[in-house]
């Protein structure tokens, strides 16, 4: 029906809400801003790691309510990020930037699984590439998910490979809801086969108390705020307008998806 549609601009990275096949068939270019929010999302991921490794949100919530019977309560004992082995599911811009922060700031060992990244590329990033996802999970203290939601990544993390996580491992998903099977994650956290997890993306958004994950004290939720910083929003706005104008003016778009 949009017979005069000339271009679709995505204010962000993920294009799972756009019918790319239809756009391609109709010859409508789709552009996005893949680099504008990289730093903001990477920083949130590190923040979530710090939160769940040190029980920050749990301590805050309980301190505002019933409180604790002593200082430094034993049940709130956390773990350090320093020196941990971090598994990167996906080695794109966000994942690499997050890895850079962890490597420089916490002396982390970086490992990665990404079928679209060669060993040579991974080596140049300072990341040990794994060809098998489960083997990487078995070696990881912390696992971060940074992949788009596609038919091949839907339920990429589910009961089958959650069993390969270390019992004391933590999981972060700030990518897309649906990449991690939420029911399977709930069971792993409930039965403590996984230490803790944090998600910034859910199947149903924004997240609410209807989601069983919200009943767990070893789970932290944020309402898809990865790119929600003043700096990233400004960059995304400027870049998407620039790219749309490039297409309309017959120029080459730098970040064309289709």
Please place each PLM-identified region on the residue numbering.
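Short glycine-/small-residue-rich Rossmann-like dinucleotide-binding loops
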Residues: 13, 141, 147-149, 175-176, ...
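Rossmann-like dinucleotide/phosphate-binding beta-alpha-beta segment
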Residues: 74-167
